Swiss-Prot record:
Alphabetic keyword roster: ATP-binding, Cell cycle, Cell division, Cell shape, Cell wall biogenesis/degradation, Cytoplasm, Ligase, Nucleotide-binding, Peptidoglycan synthesis
NCBIfam families for this protein: murC
UniProt GO molecular function: ATP binding; UDP-N-acetylmuramate-L-alanine ligase activity
Keyword Signal: no
Class in the EC hierarchy, top level: ligase
Any Pfam family hit: Mur_ligase
Lineage, broadest ranks: Bacteria, Pseudomonadati, Pseudomonadota, Gammaproteobacteria, Lysobacterales
Homology family: Belongs to the MurCDEF family.
This protein's GO CC annotations: cytoplasm
Provenance organism: Xylella fastidiosa (strain 9a5c)
Name listed for the protein in its UniProt record: UDP-N-acetylmuramate--L-alanine ligase
Amino acid sequence: MIRRLQDNGDLIRAFPRVHFVGIGGAGMTGIAEVMLTLGYEVSGSDNADNAATRRLATLGARVMRGHSAANVLGTDCVVVSSAIREDNPELMEARSQRIPIMPRAAMLAELMRFRHGIAVAGTHGKTTTTSLIAAVLSEGGLDPTFVIGGQLLAAGANAKLGAGQWLVVEADESDGSFLRLNPLVAVVTNIDADHLENYGNDFSRIKDAFTEFLQRLPFYGLALLCLDDPEVAELAGKARRHVMTYGIDAAADVRAEDVVQDGARMCFTLCLPEGKVIPVTLALPGRHNVLNALAASAVGWQLGVPPEVIGRALKSFVGIGRRFNDLGDVAIGNGACVRLIDDYGHHPRELEAVFAAVRGGWPDKRLVVAFQPHRYSRTRDQFDAFAAVLSSVDALVLSEVYPAGEVPIPGADAKALARAIRARGRSEPVVVGQVASLIEVLPDVLQEGDLLLMMGAGDIGSIAQRIAHDGFVFGEV
């Protein structure tokens, strides 16, 4: 019998059980939490536990360790992460049982059907920008739903079901899945050469995908574009939709003037349309974060959030997990301490932006970087850029590449990168095989008063947390 489904409540009653394959992924946990809050029965599987899966379990999700065909029995729909292989036993069982299978981005698009979507795309800055937009709209009383790729520290989660009509999400360009979304507002922060393997190693195809992303807006939709990024600026003439620009560039519709860094804060004048001007203190360091804040300000202004409320939201924003997280002072022995910062940056342009933020806020400190490269393909494709930016720091420790499912590529490992950096004559990198070895190696590199920046998108963040909590290990691990 075919049922007539009138609203989302009918959908939940008809198809209540949703299973997530790879539920621990950054893009999956937020969708799972929103669906739990909507009333779905959520289950999921992953090969490893993390804080997000443990949170889902406390909220009522059934989370299984490892993948098994039995995990999908009785499920009405299977949501799959892009990291899951086609021969996964749960996917194979779902196909044999004719259970609907939804890619992660397709399920995100389904959630967007019931709300006005704001999708944030761009090679860098998506998570911070999405979080800032959610903070501005929340401060403005719009109570948005949001799904973010990192933990919004103020909420203690990377997702929340709000009572308002707006849904704020990250739009992932890495595999082209952002083209499944149909937002009302599209933000593009920047466009860079990353994930080229998914675009035939052709940068022009990435740019074409962003153009198509904007063309998916309805005729009454809005494209918010960063004028400071030359690739994004080119989109303004191709969008064929309503466009608003933002940036530090003097021609931007929403812009920042008189930008000054004060330690971990940025101070600037926010210039909005119609002559609205307010002083802003942003509780995040770096010029790149000013641009992220301008995107959020533009969205807030478009949706009627008063300028003073926008300023208040930016000032009170406490950040996102693993985005320039100040973990405090850590002892290195003999009464000496260093300042520890943890950051997710894993692309040369991201490293450059974070290094600039450190030097702008703490110009007198020696910058020591512990970096875990992420993916052999990215290390190969950005090899010279990595060597250039990493050779600029005062001291460097490299761990082996975090593979993220890739097989090693000759000449794209940590030792090869160290040789290229050494050849530039500025620094002598230290290479460790396992990222956990940083705990015992770093004390020999560090000096009193250093700023230690631990960066990478792999598991180096867990090592930073261990150091912050337990300190360094002197002697044997």
